[in-house]
UniProtKB/Swiss-Prot annotation:
It comes from Human papillomavirus type 32. Pfam families: E6 (PF00518). A zinc finger (unnamed) spans 31-67, 104-140. GO terms for molecular function: DNA binding; zinc ion binding. It is found in: Host cytoplasm; Host nucleus. Keywords: Activator, DNA-binding, Early protein, Host cytoplasm, Host nucleus, Host-virus interaction, Inhibition of host innate immune response by virus, Metal-binding, Modulation of host cell apoptosis by virus, Transcription, Transcription regulation, Viral immunoevasion, Zinc, Zinc-finger. Belongs to the papillomaviridae E6 protein family. HAMAP family: HPV_E6 (MF_04006). Forms homodimers. Interacts with ubiquitin-protein ligase UBE3A/E6-AP; this interaction stimulates UBE3A ubiquitin activity. Interacts with host TP53 and EP300; this interaction inhibits TP53 activity. This is Protein E6. GO terms for cellular component: host cell cytoplasm; host cell nucleus. The gene is E6. The lineage of its organism: Viruses, Monodnaviria, Shotokuvirae, Cossaviricota, Papovaviricetes. Plays a major role in the induction and maintenance of cellular transformation. E6 associates with host UBE3A/E6-AP ubiquitin-protein ligase and modulates its activity. Sequesters tumor suppressor TP53 in the host cytoplasm and modulates its activity by interacting with host EP300 that results in the reduction of TP53 acetylation and activation. In turn, apoptosis induced by DNA damage is inhibited. E6 also protects host keratinocytes from apoptosis by mediating the degradation of host BAK1. May also inhibit host immune response. InterPro entries: E6, E6_sf. GO terms for biological process: DNA-templated transcription; regulation of DNA-templated transcription; symbiont-mediated perturbation of host apoptosis; symbiont-mediated perturbation of host ubiquitin-like protein modification; symbiont-mediated suppression of host innate immune response; symbiont-mediated suppression of host type I interferon-mediated signaling pathway.
Amino acid sequence: MASTSASSQPSTLYQLCKDFGLTLRNLQICCIWCKNHLTSAEAYAYHFKDLHVVWKKGFPYAACAFCLEFYSKVCALRHYDRSAFWHTVEQETGLLLEEQIIRCAICQKPLSPSEKDHHIYNGRHFRFILNRWTGRCTQCRE
């Protein structure tokens, strides 16, 4: 499945499957960290979270659920900058929350409008980690 040029390499699992005539169900892709094959459920979740394929030495990789959560937590611990309420996030970015893609700090899923609203109405902070604002999705809330 090696590709010739970086510009022609698919950046999503959907595009990868389309280019190679596969379905997410029968896609065999390894985790970038642990090198285990993703299960069908993990491949669907990776696609649903709109995460990108990582290319290494001409081969595509994704991230299994365990490694994605583990390395997200490591990243949060190492690169946490600050926390702020929604109005500060809007003020700093110059964009309304609904115009921004804010991912869950744990599972990396883009937060839905209702998940962003949960932060607003319940006084929850967003966290600035690695130069981007993150929050917590419904499944990963403490």
